[in-house]
Amino acid sequence: MTVLYIDADACPVKDEVYKVAARYGLKTFVVSNSWIRVPLTPAIEQIVVDAGPDIADDWIAERAGPGDVVITNDIPLADRVLKAGGAALGTTGRLFTVDTIGSALASRMIGEHLRSMGEITSGPKAFGPADRSKFLQALDTAVVKARRVVR
């Protein structure tokens, strides 16, 4: 059965994920390093991990596998999920694939290098209604595809 995992710290589309999870009856883990409000339903479980780099990512990566969908903007986590056979979807609806993850990792490393040299890089653009709509469509598509995966 498909499971959804939300890398929930700073995730702007949690409510959208809850709606899709309810529509398909999917177990959903909301993973963060602090308490956040989640719907009171047995299908949605909040996991609070210790604060620290990559602890939430590790929790998700150790569990996600074929047929699961992970919602994250963390490119290294997306890479780990793909290597485990799962699907990784960014909050803007960007589906990470084995064909695109390498360039995403490279772009991330270049940005980190530029920032370490004192270069000012632009952050992400403001998140708006069109982004939410694109995300919902992409999540629905990812869930339909993931449900076809044989575990």
From Swiss-Prot:
InterPro entries: UPF0178
Source organism, top-level taxon: Bacteria
Disulfide bridge partners, by residue number: none
Entry similarity comment: Belongs to the UPF0178 family.
Family annotation (PANTHER family): UPF0178 PROTEIN YAII
NCBIfam families: PRK00124.1
Protein name, UniProt field: UPF0178 protein Caul_3070
Species whose genome carries this gene: Caulobacter sp. (strain K31)
Upper taxonomic lineage: Bacteria, Pseudomonadati, Pseudomonadota, Alphaproteobacteria, Caulobacterales
